[in-house]
């Protein structure tokens, strides 16, 4: 019973994180199929120069994360679009993901709206803005060094191949209905974030709105995903639900774009969720058996001074 209770309590503690991961999976699929991400990619490729893309991505994610106080929301929304822009401009996934995550977590650490920042200052009984000021001693130099690295990497990137970017833009136009109306979805999401609506509610409403826009602007794609020969609301709804929970692969004449618009929905988050559940089960068993306390006590004996800590 003790083991069962400890494991149950651990899993209950990460239930919110698991729900957020599932909604992020659904959001990433719906934002792609609805045309929101393709629209952001289409306009982003025309605005952001490849030489400064990585540094710009880091700064954009940092600013949004500071304003929202949520690195997860930043990565799940604007991060997806920036990943698409970077891949279209020929950058490797690792560089793009590094720029997105670096900016998002920097903003999260110094944002007065961040739950982790507020929690840390509360636990240590430190005024919030004093805590942020001390955090900036390490985070700001880290960000500056990171921006220098991303700038050098961006300037070293071959930005002369504009034909490739033009081909991706043309393929996007052929596959999706690109329209400024689709920008309403990220704008509404930004408003919800600014009004401090909880992350789960924000992501859910953003997914729901993108689903409505998918039915309006991308019915042909939903029909293709559903695999149903006869067009109708049932087939469109089936295509929408398949995008939410499973993998979707749409064929285009551009190999880069075909890979770019492939989504995995909620199913893409299952490996991470299984890992979290296994870790919680292991941690619960270690706690209930007393082994975790025994191991911790050994380390505590040596933590007598600041240097040893």
For the regions a protein language model found, what residue spans apply to each?
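Membrane-spanning helices that line or support transport/gating and their immediate boundary helices
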Residues: 39, 43, 105, 109-112, ...
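Hydrophobic transmembrane alpha-helices of multi-pass small-molecule transporters
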Residues: 1-19, 137-145, 158-274
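Alpha-helical membrane-inserting segments
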Residues: 27, 31, 64, 68, ...
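Short alpha-helical transmembrane interface motifs in multi-pass membrane proteins
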Residues: 24, 98-103, 134, 171-174, ...
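Transmembrane helix-loop junctions in multipass membrane proteins, especially transporters and channels
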Residues: 33, 37, 70-74, 120, ...
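Hydrophobic transmembrane alpha-helices that form the pore/transport pathway of multi-pass ion
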Residues: 47-141, 307-309
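Membrane-embedded alpha-helical segments and adjacent helix-loop junctions characteristic
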Residues: 2-87, 246-309
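Juxtamembrane and boundary regions of transmembrane helices in multi-pass small-molecule transporters
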Residues: 109-171, 181, 285
């Amino acid at each position: 019973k003790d083991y069962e209770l400890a494991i149950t309590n651990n899993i209950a503690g990460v239930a919110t994180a698991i729900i957020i991961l599932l909604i992020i999976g659904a959001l990433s699929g719906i934002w792609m199929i609805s045309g929101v991400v393709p629209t952001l990619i289409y306009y982003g490729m025309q605005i952001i120069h490849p030489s400064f893309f990585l540094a710009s991505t880091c700064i954009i994610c940092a600013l949004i994360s500071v304003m929202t106080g949520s690195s997860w929301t930043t990565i799940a929304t604007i991060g997806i679009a920036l990943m698409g822009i970077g891949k279209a401009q020929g950058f490797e996934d690792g560089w793009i993901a590094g720029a997105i995550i670096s900016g998002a977590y920097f903003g999260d650490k110094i944002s007065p709206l961040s739950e982790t920042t507020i929690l840390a200052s509360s636990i240590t009984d430190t005024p919030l803005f004093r805590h942020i000021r001390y955090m900036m001693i390490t985070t700001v130099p880290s960000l500056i060094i990171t921006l220098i690295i991303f700038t050098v990497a961006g300037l070293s990137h071959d930005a002369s191949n504009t034909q490739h970017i033009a081909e991706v833009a043309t393929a996007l136009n052929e596959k999706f209905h690109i329209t400024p109306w689709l920008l309403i979805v990220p704008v509404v999401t930004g408003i919800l974030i600014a009004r401090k609506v909880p992350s789960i509610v924000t992501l859910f409403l953003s997914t729901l709105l993108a689903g409505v826009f998918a039915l309006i602007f991308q019915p042909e794609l939903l029909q293709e995903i559903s695999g149903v020969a006869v067009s109708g609301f049932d087939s469109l709804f089936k295509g929408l639900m398949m995008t939410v929970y499973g993998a979707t692969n749409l064929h285009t004449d551009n190999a880069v774009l075909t890979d770019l618009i492939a989504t995995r929905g909620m199913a893409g988050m299952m490996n991470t969720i299984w890992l979290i559940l296994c870790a919680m089960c292991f941690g619960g068993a270690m706690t209930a058996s007393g082994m975790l306390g025994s191991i911790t006590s050994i380390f505590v004996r040596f933590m007598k001074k600041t240097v040893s800590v």
